A protein has these predicted regions:
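Short acidic linear motifs
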Residues: 2-391
């Protein structure tokens, strides 16, 4: 009896230990598998990044590559500081600034949004208060002179520094490149439109020429977005000049210098694509560190894992690895597309991405189409201006 009881107790202890050991063993196996998956995804991403760096950037780091493209004096930092000053400037006076059914605070930035963003025909139909326009022009004269000096630099280009992270590339604690661009463009267009509205055509023409010079210097874009904004800015300047000449507000001869500036945008697509490659390699450092755990692939095969989507609680188990895997495929495809561009001439043909969802590759394909249509428009308006100047 005693022996039977002792044997039963031992069996219970044995199975209890087995019951405790199996989950622990499974946890160890899953953790080991998890670490293998993480290490594998990081190794694949490293390989794709290194191949892109060697094949596209000639073996240089993103900082070395972007800095090597800039020759002479670079006016970007001066432009950024001026944009920050415009952004943070106090009110010029009380109340608001209104024109063309638009209203903003009576600050340099507010006036820039009204006079710089609205198209000329609308401003002409519904002009702002002339006295407030004069106050704005007087209050911002020093900034205008600074932009005139910046336009005499050799180039305006954002570069990557040795200690930069991807967050620094996006602006860090300062303005992003796009914000710098928009604030300076809106500001100068606002001053040009302001002078034209109060009848000072000669100064308006000088302001327009300064904007055109600034855009002619933005010939080393760091991404397709920067190339697109260059094209948009040049198009805006040319169309505004055409309006003024046709209306007789300024003489075509006053803008003769305008047509001598470098207005090529489409030929810069390979330059922008290589710059984008440099920024994506910098971004890879952040992707490498994305925290993740692995969940069994069959657990939720239907979910779209994204590091930016916390809607599904199980995303946290797979999103890091899947994101790295997607980024690896994207880098390889994008690098191949960039290299294909180097042997072409406009209009460029960008092959379709061979895997659905490769956003960076799709962006390059869309950029090639968009930039081509913008270049056609720029060339057409420029040709029309040349005809008016020849009369």
């Amino acid at each position: 009896m005693g022996n039977a009881y002792l044997g039963g107790w031992r069996r219970r202890v044995f199975w209890t230990l087995i019951a405790l050991a199996i989950p622990a063993l499974i946890a160890v196996c899953v953790e080991s598998w998890r670490q293998m998956q993480i290490a594998s995804s990081r190794a694949e991403l490293d390989d794709a990044c290194e191949r892109a760096r060697v094949d596209v950037l000639g073996g240089m780091t993103p900082a070395q590559f972007t800095q090597s493209r800039v020759k002479g004096t670079n006016g970007y930092e001066r432009l950024r500081k001026l944009a920050e000053a415009i952004d943070n400037a106090p009110p010029i006076g009380p109340g608001t600034f209104e024109a063309a059914d638009d209203s903003e605070p009576f600050t340099p930035m507010g006036v820039s949004k009204v006079l710089g963003v609205q198209e000329w025909p609308r401003l002409k139909r519904d002009p702002p208060d002339a006295e407030k326009t004069r106050l704005f022009l007087a209050a911002t004269e020093a900034w205008s002179a600074e932009l005139e000096e910046i336009s005499r630099c050799d180039v305006i280009a954002q570069v990557i520094h040795d200690v930069d992270t991807y967050g620094d590339l996006l602006g860090g604690d300062s303005l992003t490149w796009l914000q710098v661009h928009l604030r300076s463009l809106w500001f100068m267009l606002a001053r040009a439109n302001g002078h034209a509205l109060i009848g000072d055509g000669e100064v308006a023409a000088r302001q327009l020429l300064t904007i055109a010079r600034l855009y002619s210097l933005m010939r080393v874009p760091l991404c397709e977005l920067q190339l697109n904004t260059r094209a948009w800015g040049i198009s805006s300047v040319l169309n505004l000049a055409l309006h003024w000449v046709k209306e007789g507000r300024i003489a075509a001869a006053q803008l003769k210098e305008l047509t001598s500036f470098n207005m090529d945008c489409e030929p810069l697509l390979p330059v922008a694509a290589k710059g984008e490659m440099a920024s994506k390699i910098l971004f890879e450092q952040w992707v490498q560190e994305w925290p993740s755990e692995v969940w069994f692939g069959w657990a939720r095969p239907d979910i779209e894992d994204s590091p930016f989507d916390d809607g599904d609680r199980q995303n946290k188990y797979t999103r890091g690895i899947r994101y790295r895997e997607g980024w690896t495929t994207g880098l390889r495809t994008y690098a191949a597309q960039v290299l294909e561009l180097q042997d072409q001439s406009p209009p460029y043909i960008v092959r379709t991405a061979d895997q659905q969802g490769l956003v960076m590759s799709a962006n390059l394909q869309a950029a090639s189409t968009r930039i081509h249509s913008q270049q056609v428009e720029i060339d057409a308006v420029r040709a029309e201006l040349l005809k008016l100047m020849a009369k």
